[in-house]
């Protein structure tokens, strides 16, 4: 593969402002960020393939910019608890596939209520939603959406503290997506989706998962 002259990248700049609120029932944190330059495309993990196209096509995203808004927090009332996470972002002017200038916006929201059963156990639920829309220079656009619902039995040293770790979760999760290739079932020849390794799967827009998860912080 022949590479063109490497593009000249400008320095990336990030300006962030955060506000922390602490009150008797819990806490809440709000963050607003403005990102200018090539790193404006990285929040969705786009950095690797943007670097690739920059080397191959000689592009850069020096004029790209992004706004991000984050809000998350927790609240506790007796044996009941509640946590949430909200994220919104909008960006434009970054290089995508080939030489197109792209813009995107995305929103996600997750809530996680729980009920403490004993000092070391609790029942928790999790509801989540996301949507992302990307617009291309040629006028075309793509939209992806997904939802999830989880119910879990959780063991931890202090079940009333959402930060308590290590944590063992036994869970069942329902997933739904409008991108049928995001969720796949057992191999099938009826509706072909060929993966990179040549495996053929049948696409689907929903999935149920049972599992166990061990999480530790240090």
Predicted regions and their residues:
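Extended hydrophobic secondary-structure segments that form protein cores and membrane-embedded regions
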Residues: 1, 29-34, 166-175
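Detector for outer-membrane/organellar transmembrane beta-barrel domains
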Residues: 2-137, 143-151, 155
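Residues in intrinsically disordered, low-complexity segments of regulatory proteins
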Residues: 48, 52, 161, 216-217
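Short, P/G- and charge-enriched loop/turn segments at secondary-structure junctions
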Residues: 82, 199-200
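Tryptophan-centered motif/residue detector
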Residues: 117, 177, 217-218
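C-terminal structured domain segments
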Residues: 140-198
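Outer-membrane beta-barrel "beta-signal"
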Residues: 151, 155-157, 201-218
């Amino acid at each position: 593969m022949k590479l063109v002259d490497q593009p000249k990248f400008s320095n990336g700049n990030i300006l962030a402002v955060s506000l922390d609120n602490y009150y008797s029932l819990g806490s809440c944190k709000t963050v607003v960020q403005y990102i200018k330059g090539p790193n404006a495309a990285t929040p969705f993990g786009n950095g690797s393939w943007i670097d690739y196209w920059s080397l191959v096509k000689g592009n850069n995203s020096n004029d790209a910019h992004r706004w991000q808004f984050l809000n998350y927090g927790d609240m506790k009332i007796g044996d009941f608890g509640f946590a949430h996470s909200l994220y919104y972002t909008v960006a434009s002017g970054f290089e995508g596939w080939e030489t197109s200038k792209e813009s995107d916006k995305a929103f996600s929201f997750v809530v996680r209520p729980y009920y403490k059963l004993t000092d070391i156990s609790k029942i928790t639920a999790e509801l989540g939603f996301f949507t992302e829309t990307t617009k291309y220079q040629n006028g075309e656009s793509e939209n992806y959406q997904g939802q999830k619902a989880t119910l879990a039995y959780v063991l931890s040293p202090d079940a009333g503290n959402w930060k308590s770790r290590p944590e063992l979760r036994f869970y069942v999760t329902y997933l739904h997506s409008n991108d049928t290739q995001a969720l796949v079932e057992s191999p099938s020849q009826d509706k072909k989706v060929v993966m990179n390794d040549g495996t053929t799967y049948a696409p689907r827009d929903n999935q149920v998962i049972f599992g166990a998860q061990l999480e530790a912080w240090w």
